[in-house]
């Protein structure tokens, strides 16, 4: 079994999402010691934002791609191949400005490739990356899951569920710690709740 461990927080050792994603991987391996782990730190090795050079080879017919276009295409192929070769993907995904870190979005944009992770048929979109499990370490400074107003502002977990569902992945598990910036007691409660989620997510 192959596990891809992805972190995206820019906070380094201060990051709770990094702490939780590492704990998830460790818990997963306790009962599956044969799991091989590959690590991707998007804060240290962020792909370029998806631009014209990245899509040129696949989306625009031209006689000879430029060196920049070849380089961007090679990076996209490397990332999507790594993703498709993984059985389990553990993602540290903090809540930044109501959504996910830009580095994580840039990675997902490289994965969203027609013919690799999705296609279309007469009924609409069809995900091609089936049979995988995604576990998200979701961290938030405030509390957004407990009210309609908060849920309306949340485009982090909801986005990840939609995009991985679009890729054909129906097993998306959330390990959530929210309210981390609301004081010591709420933070302790959030971490306790996250570890309870973790026990279920790694079972």
UniProtKB/Swiss-Prot annotation:
Co-factor remark: Binds 1 FMN per subunit.
Keywords: Flavoprotein, FMN, NAD, Oxidoreductase
Catalytic activity entry: 2 a quinone + NADH + H(+) = 2 a 1,4-benzosemiquinone + NAD(+); N,N-dimethyl-1,4-phenylenediamine + anthranilate + 2 NAD(+) = 2-(4-dimethylaminophenyl)diazenylbenzoate + 2 NADH + 2 H(+)
Pfam families: Flavodoxin_2
GO molecular function, one term: FMN binding
Presence of the UniProt keyword NAD in the record: yes
Entries under InterPro entries matching the protein: Flavodoxin_fold, Flavoprotein-like_sf, FMN-dep_NADH:Q_OxRdtase_AzoR1, NADH:quinone_OxRdtase_FMN_depd
Cofactor(s) required, per the database record: FMN
UniProt-annotated binding residues for FMN: 9, 15-17, 139-142
Enzyme nomenclature, EC number: 1.6.5.-, 1.7.1.17
Enzyme class, UniProt record, top EC level: oxidoreductase
PANTHER family: FMN-DEPENDENT NADH-AZOREDUCTASE 1 (PTHR43741), FMN-DEPENDENT NADH:QUINONE OXIDOREDUCTASE (PTHR43741:SF4)
Self-association and partners: Homodimer.
Membership in a protein family: Belongs to the azoreductase type 1 family.
Function as written in the Swiss-Prot or TrEMBL entry: Quinone reductase that provides resistance to thiol-specific stress caused by electrophilic quinones.
Identification of the protein by name: FMN-dependent NADH:quinone oxidoreductase
Source species: Albidiferax ferrireducens (strain ATCC BAA-621 / DSM 15236 / T118)
Gene name of the encoded protein: azoR
């Amino acid at each position: 079994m192959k596990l891809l461990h992805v972190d995206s927080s820019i906070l380094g050792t201060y990051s709770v999402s990094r702490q939780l994603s590492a704990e998830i991987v460790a818990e997963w391996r306790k009962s599956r010691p044969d799991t091989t782990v590959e690590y991707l730190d998007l804060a240290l090795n962020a792909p370029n934002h998806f631009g014209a050079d990245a899509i040129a080879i696949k989306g625009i017919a031209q006689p000879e791609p430029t060196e920049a276009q070849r380089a961007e295409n090679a990076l996209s192929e490397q990332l999507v191949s790594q993703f498709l070769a993984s059985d389990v993907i553990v993602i540290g995904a903090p809540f930044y400005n109501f959504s996910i870190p830009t580095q994580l979005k840039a990675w997902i944009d490289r994965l969203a490739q027609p013919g690799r992770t999705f296609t279309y048929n007469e009924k609409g979109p069809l995900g091609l990356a089936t049979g995988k499990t995604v576990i998200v370490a979701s961290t938030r400074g405030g509390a957004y899951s407990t009210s309609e107003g908060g849920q309306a502002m949340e485009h982090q977990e909801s986005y990840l569920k939609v995009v991985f569902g679009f890729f054909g992945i129906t097993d998306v598990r959330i390990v959530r710690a929210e309210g981390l910036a609301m004081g010591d007691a709420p933070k302790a409660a959030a971490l306790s709740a996250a570890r309870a989620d973790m026990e279920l997510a790694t079972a």
